[in-house]
């Protein structure tokens, strides 16, 4: 392992021991905020330091085995050779695990996220496919124990959605869905196609981590235009009876958000403000991170909706992710929500890029 990585691990070990000592001091125990912050730091350092101590012990065991091979009798040498073989086999996986523990944590990974699916080129077929994509994500969310709340939707004339916006809540939502932003292309024979010709259409997906609180983004109320209107689409008897739906326009940026799912105008307004804050924060972060690494831009997405990331080919039963040249012939399972075989390799590739950056 590189000396720079070992030096970093040694510093973390020293800090861990320092924090451990501080947590037993009376003045720290009596200061709730300080105690909470140190406890959090201790919990973050502990898995790294425990793994590092295991690594140091492994190195010590290797040296001990080598010493016995050089100095011991025949029986001892045979045992030591077996021990050395076992230790050396564990060395590389242990080093890799340590390096993974050192990877910077994405502060957004544990956040809920807004999921937007929009029909692109392809007319009615694109709208139908946007419905298929949203159903795919909803079923995947079920397997993860997440909750999906639809905030607004515009239905297609022949099914599906021109646009559907939802909030996905649960554990580690953004860490899994962050690889989904971009253009998704479908190749299939539409039900309305009498000649059996394959059509190509596309939908765009945007995934944005939910802003923690509105305070994260400075929103001047004078910059907002707020309109109320009657909700449309499915929703029961209350639809079209009250102006409960909310549309908020952020005049400086032109961002428009809507929420029509809740029966209460107050709740719709709160949801719309949260979505607006998230969009503004995402815009600010994209502007601040223009120098982001090419690898991360390719995998997590640049926010450019025209960036084609995946093709769903129905005649061949094929799903291809163009960012990592991944091809799977399990389209039916993927569309039923079995996304792990797609998301897993993307996450692994992303992690490999980060590890390469550490090694540089």
From Swiss-Prot:
Task: Supply the Pfam families for this chain.
Answer: PCRF, RF-1
Compartment list: Cytoplasm
Name positions with the PTM N5-methylglutamine: 237
Q: What is its main location?
A: cytoplasm
Disulfide cross-links? none
InterPro entries reported for this sequence = PCRF (IPR005139), Pep_chain_release_fac_I (IPR000352), Pep_chain_release_fac_I_sf (IPR045853), Prokaryotic/Mito_RF (IPR050057), RF-1 (IPR004373)
SUPFAM superfamilies noted in UniProt: Release factor (SSF75620)
Gene Ontology molecular-function annotations:
translation release factor activity, codon specific
**Keywords, A to Z?**
Cytoplasm, Methylation, Protein biosynthesis
**What are the record's GO terms for cellular component?**
cytoplasm
**Modification note:** Methylated by PrmC. Methylation increases the termination efficiency of RF1.
Q: Which family does it belong to?
A: Belongs to the prokaryotic/mitochondrial release factor family.
NCBIfam families the UniProt entry points to: prfA (TIGR00019), PRK00591.1 (NF001859)
Q: What does this protein do?
A: Peptide chain release factor 1 directs the termination of translation in response to the peptide chain termination codons UAG and UAA.
- The protein here is known as Peptide chain release factor 1
Gene name, per UniProt, is prfA
């Amino acid at each position: 392992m590189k000396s720079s990585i070992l030096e970093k691990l040694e510093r973390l070990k020293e800090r861990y021991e320092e924090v451990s000592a501080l947590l037993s001091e009376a003045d720290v125990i009596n200061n709730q905020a300080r105690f909470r912050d140190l406890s959090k730091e201790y919990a973050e350092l502990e898995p790294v330091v425990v793994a590092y101590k295991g690594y140091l012990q492994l190195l010590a065991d290797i040296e001990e085995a080598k010493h016995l091979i050089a100095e011991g009798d025949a029986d001892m040498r045979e045992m030591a050779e077996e021990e050395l073989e076992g230790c050396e086999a564990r060395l590389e996986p242990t080093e890799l695990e340590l390096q993974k523990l050192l990877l910077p944590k994405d502060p957004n990974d544990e956040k809920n996220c807004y999921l937007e699916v929009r029909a692109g080129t392809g007319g009615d077929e694109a709208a139908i496919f946007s419905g298929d994509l949203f159903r795919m994500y909803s079923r995947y969310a079920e397997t993860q124990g997440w909750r999906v709340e639809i905030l607004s939707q515009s239905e297609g004339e022949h099914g599906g959605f021109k646009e559907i916006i939802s909030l996905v809540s649960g554990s580690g939502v953004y860490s899994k869905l962050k690889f989904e932003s971009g253009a998704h292309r479908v190749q299939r024979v539409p039900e309305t196609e009498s000649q059996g010709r394959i059509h190509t259409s596309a939908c765009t997906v945007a995934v944005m981590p939910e802003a923690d609180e509105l305070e994260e983004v400075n929103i001047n109320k004078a910059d907002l235009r707020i309109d109320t209107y009657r909700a449309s689409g499915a929703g029961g008897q209350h639809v079209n009876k009250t102006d409960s739906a909310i549309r908020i326009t952020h005049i400086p940026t032109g961002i428009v958000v809507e929420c029509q799912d809740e029966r209460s105008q107050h709740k719709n307004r709160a949801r719309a403000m949260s979505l607006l804050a998230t969009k503004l924060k995402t815009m600010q972060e994209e502007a601040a991170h223009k120098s982001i690494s090419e690898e991360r831009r390719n995998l997590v997405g640049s926010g450019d909706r025209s960036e084609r990331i995946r093709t769903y080919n129905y005649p061949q039963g094929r799903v291809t992710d163009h960012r990592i040249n991944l091809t799977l012939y399990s389209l039916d399972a993927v569309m039923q929500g079995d996304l792990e075989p797609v998301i897993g390799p993307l996450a692994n590739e992303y992690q490999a890029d980060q590890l390469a950056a550490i090694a540089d």
